[in-house]
């Protein structure tokens, strides 16, 4: 995922995040698919999750492997929930605009 190259300057941190992504990619997509209505939304959720993980790299580097996996699961789930809430808000605004016409 190219996001590592743009968000993380440190080579070791970038390698760590790449490993986290590779080890958890299928899991992240599986969780995101439970909340997404299409493939593009699923990819957006995973991308947003990876971005959040990169921002918290100092915190997650200190986690043991089992805790790291749980952290990733919760991060994807929370990102997906926030994504759905945001989509619902957008749809509500669109509906209000169309009702005003």
Residue ranges, per PLM feature:
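Structural recognition of an alpha-helix C-terminal capping motif at a helix-to-coil junction
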Residues: 30, 44-51, 55, 66-78
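N-terminal module of bacterial RNA polymerase sigma factors
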Residues: 1-27, 34, 55-57
């Amino acid at each position: 995922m190219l996001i590592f190259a743009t968000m993380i300057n440190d080579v070791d941190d970038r390698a760590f995040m790449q490993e986290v992504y590779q080890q958890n990619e299928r899991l992240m997509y599986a969780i995101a698919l439970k909340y997404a209505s299409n493939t593009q939304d699923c990819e957006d959720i995973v991308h947003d999750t990876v971005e959040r993980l990169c921002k918290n790299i100092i915190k997650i580097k200190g986690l043991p492997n089992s805790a790291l996996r749980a952290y990733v699961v919760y991060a994807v789930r929370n990102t997906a929930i926030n994504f759905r809430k945001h989509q619902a808000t957008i749809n509500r605004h669109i509906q209000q605009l169309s009702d005003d016409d």
